[in-house]
Amino acid sequence: MSNKLVLVLNCGSSSLKFAIIDALTGDDQISGLAECFGLEDAKIKWKVNGVKHDASLGAFSSHREAVEFIVKDVLGAHPEIASQIQAIGHRVVHGGEKFTQSVIIDESVVQGIEDCAALAPLHNPAHLIGIRAAQASFPQLPQVAVFDTAFHQTMPEKAFIYALPYKLYRENSIRRYGMHGTSHLFISREAAKAMGKNIEDSNIICAHLGNGASVTAIKGGKSVDTSMGMTPLEGLVMGTRCGDIDPSIIHHLVDRLGYTLDEVNNLMNKQSGLLGISELTNDCRGIEEGYSEGHKGATLALEIFCYRLAKYIASYTVPLGRLDAVVFTGGIGENSDLIRAKVLNLLEIFNFEVDDERNKAARFGNQGQITTDNGTIAMVIPTNEEWVIAEDAVRLLK
């Protein structure tokens, strides 16, 4: 264990993921999840050296109580780890155009995150609560914000401007921002290493596939296009999000079918995607099980998911010009050999030849190439966003 440990916090509206990461190796010393904030059964679970623990936080507990528990109970039991923590790293979903890289948190940064809350109303307010809670519990430690959107700030205007009146961008910042940037950044580095290339000479397409999913074209280590938009709703079919649709559907739902705008927002974010199509589940494992059993809805959901993903990957060869590799990551990307094979088979024109043995081996945390040596490379690389956050925190403190 090095003396460069960072406590990484990822605050959701009703949960808090945490991990203590060695910034040199990426290893986690402690990791856990506090959840059900505001409810009677608010709880926390964590793991130290492979040993699992859990506890109640007390009815209606919040982020503050969770951070206090981490300090007093989790770290209190491991002073040898607590004494080595150098900084707190916060994942922040949306930094708008203001934050193009990670920053040390001060009051101006807090205000900037608050100013971007309209672009991520479910996420940024929760991040601010977590930042305040961490500042109260760790007043002696520097705090660093790492933004999901920052990696995509290298996109050219032709990739991020919507074909709406330009003044909406100029006056209201309506544009494509993209998400999962920290994951895409990590994957771009690791993919270049795996291919034995300098990152400046590598062109990859990264597919981060989980309940939320996005694809990014990365040229020379920089994002040049990405599938998520102003919000995480645009792009691929996801667990409960619809991804790309005809915008006039919104007017039709409101004007003809009597939906309110809030109901439409809920429908497209929480009732659509794999769940909406299959009428079964948003969990890809359940979709694959239904597919294997001949469930019509699950089969259709799986086919649409793979088809949409393959189309995006194909289109991102345009900004790259040359494709060195496609990389799958995220919960689905790292574990579903079925989806990977289906997607790559749809991309046969790009000379992908799936190696069934390699594809099945690259699951459950295993990294590796999943195509034959004769064609274009596709590989699986498990993501590690926490490591990027820890690295950035230590780098900024130098």
Swiss-Prot record:
Gene3D superfamilies xrefs: 3.30.420.40
Keyword Phosphoprotein: no
Main location: cytoplasm
SUPFAM superfamilies per record: Actin-like ATPase domain
MF term (GO), any: ATP binding
UniProt GO cellular component terms: cytosol
GO biological process, one term: acetate metabolic process
Database matches in InterPro entries: Ac/propionate_kinase, Aliphatic_acid_kin_short-chain, Aliphatic_acid_kinase_CS, ATPase_NBD
Location of this chain's protein in the cell: Cytoplasm
CDD domains tied to this protein: ASKHA_NBD_AcK_PK
Binding of Mg(2+), residues: 10, 385
Positions that bind substrate: 91
Catalytic activity: acetate + ATP = acetyl phosphate + ADP
Site residues by UniProt (Transition state stabilizer): 180, 241
Family matches, as PANTHER family: ACETATE KINASE
Binding partners and assembly: Homodimer.
Name of the protein: Acetate kinase
Organism: Shewanella woodyi (strain ATCC 51908 / MS32)
